[in-house]
From Swiss-Prot:
Alphabetically ordered keywords of this record: Copper, Electron transport, Magnesium, Membrane, Metal-binding, Mitochondrion, Mitochondrion inner membrane, Respiratory chain, Translocase, Transmembrane, Transmembrane helix, Transport
Subunit text: Component of the cytochrome c oxidase (complex IV, CIV), a multisubunit enzyme composed of 14 subunits. The complex is composed of a catalytic core of 3 subunits MT-CO1, MT-CO2 and MT-CO3, encoded in the mitochondrial DNA, and 11 supernumerary subunits COX4I, COX5A, COX5B, COX6A, COX6B, COX6C, COX7A, COX7B, COX7C, COX8 and NDUFA4, which are encoded in the nuclear genome.
CDD domains per record: CcO_II_C (cd13912)
Catalytic reaction(s) noted: 4 Fe(II)-[cytochrome c] + O2 + 8 H(+)(in) = 4 Fe(III)-[cytochrome c] + 2 H2O + 4 H(+)(out)
Protein name: Cytochrome c oxidase subunit 2
Amino acid sequence: MAHPTQLGLQDASSPIMEELLLFHDHALMTVFLISTLVLYIIMTAVSTKLTNKHLLDAQEIEIVWTVMPALVLIAIALPSLRILYLMDEINDPHLTIKATGHQWYWSYEYTDYDTLNFDSYMIPTQDLLPGQFRLLDTDNRMVVPTGSPVRMLITAEDVLHSWAVPSLGLKMDAVPGRLNQTTFIATRPGVFFGQCSEICGANHSFMPITIESAPVKYFESWSSSMLAES
């Protein structure tokens, strides 16, 4: 999760987020190099005696400032397109979960089980226990097995929402009457927080997302207890 005064993105907890972090660093380095070059040209132009101020034609430099930006754009576009295709790949998921956005909470349905579904509300500030996070913790966490491919089906019941968990590299719009899908693999155990990322009304800020990644044995125990309660 994010921390006060943090610089950079959250720690990656999925393969896609690791790819996004690498692309982020790649893009920032490209911007840094371009900025350094532009600053050097400006400083050189300021300090020169303008001996070529009447020069009207320079084919070589025109070729350079046409080809170089094209190469830079290609260097940014290719890894970006690769990540976009990776995010669309869904290969043999071990678990499918349907998340539905409401004003203002989320409901989850484990479609591989007959009756495993529940609502997930933000815990009010006055009900928080020691160690729980204000505006982030929920009364029911979405539990997934660590290291297993999980397919998410995202929709909404009323207005537009967006299901987003930054440390897993997830952000998918929840649209009424439409099913969007994405996939992720939690590479380590832990609790990951997200929030609705589409303004959806007065309590938009109060519909967090809490995902708990746990070993398979714990997940099986949790699912059995949830099925017994239902």
